[in-house]
Amino acid sequence: MDQTLIQEILEVVEQAAIASAKLSGKGLKNEADAAAVEAMRKRMGQIQMQGRIVIGEGERDEAPMLYIGEEVGSGTGPGVDFAVDPCEGTNLCAFNQRGSMAVLAASDRGGLFNAPDFYMKKLAAPPAAKGKVDIRKSATENIKILSECLGLAVDELTIVVMDRARHKDLIAEIRATGARIQPISDGDVQAAIACGFAGTGTHCLMGIGAAPEGVISAAAMRALGGHFQGQLVYDPAVAQTSEWADMTKEGNLARLAEMGITDPDKVYEAEELACGEHVCFAGSGITDGLLFHGVKFERDCTRTSSLVISNLDNTCRFTNTVHIKDGAQSIALS
C-alpha cells in the first residue's frame, strides 16, 4: 500500500457515510445499510487494485453485504484485503443517534484475519496496559491491572460494555469492583479505538460483539500501539441472540473448519488479526460520535469528518472534507 491508495480508501468510507447519512433518522435500518454498501462497493471499483473482502458484515443477519471473498477494485494493481462494515451501528443511523460510522481496515494480501461473520469476545485497552491485561483473566483482575497501569483509582475507570443480555454477569462483576460502566447499544469500534487515545475517558472495552468489527478495531489498535485481543464465539448459548435462532454450535464449528480455523477457541492478538506489513484503518462519521462528527448537508456542499490510522508512516489523520456540489456559489469556512 502507498499514500495514494490510502487516500482513495479514505474516500471509500466518506462516500459510504454520505450515502447512509441521507437515510439517517428515517427508521430505515436496512436501507441505510444497503446504501452504504453500494456506495462503498462503487468507490472501491474505481481503485486500481486487486481487492478482496476477507470479513464483512451481513452474513449473520442477512443484511446487505460486501460478501466474504468478493473481489473489488479494477482487477489490476496491488493485492489488498479488506475487513468492512459500511454502516457500523445501523440502528444508531436509523434513529439518528450518536456513534454510527462507515469503517474498514485494509492490508496487503493475506494481512487480515479471514473468518465468517460470527461473534467475538473482545478486550481493548490503552497502550500502557498492552500485554498486561488479558482476555483470559477475569474482569476483576483486568480492572485491577488497568488501575495500576494507568495510575487511576478503580472508581475512576470507565469500562464500555454493549448493553446485551449476554453481558448481565459481566456487568455485575465490573460494578462489584467499583469501576464505572458505560453501556452502548451498538457500534463498539469507536469504543475500542478510543482506548488507544489518551483523554477520551474510555479506558477499556469488554464483552462480545461482531467479529468484523473486531478485526477492524485490531487494525487500528495495532497501529496505535494499544491492546486488543479477540476470541471467536461460535456457541449460540454464549452469543444469546435471536440472529442465531436457527444456528447450532456444531454447524458453526463446521463453518469455521471450512475456513481453515482449526482452533476455534484460540485467543488472537491484534498483531494476528491484522498481521500485514502495512495495515490501515479508515472511518468516517455518519452521525456525531466520540472520534468525529457526522455528515453535514449544506446548500452548496456536504461535509464529512474522518480518521485514518496507518502504520505505513505511523500517523493518525483526522480529516474534515468539503464535498462541493455542482453549481455551488459560496462555501463557508466551517
Curated annotation (Swiss-Prot):
Mn(2+) 2 binds at D85, E88, E213. Pathway: Carbohydrate biosynthesis; Calvin cycle. It comes from the Bacteria. Its EC number is 3.1.3.11, 3.1.3.37. Signal peptide: none annotated. Substrate binds at E88, G89, T90, Y119, R164, A165, R166, D186, G187, D188. Mn(2+) 1 binds at D33, E57. This is D-fructose 1,6-bisphosphatase class 2/sedoheptulose 1,7-bisphosphatase. The lineage of its organism: Bacteria, Bacillati, Cyanobacteriota, Cyanophyceae, Synechococcales.
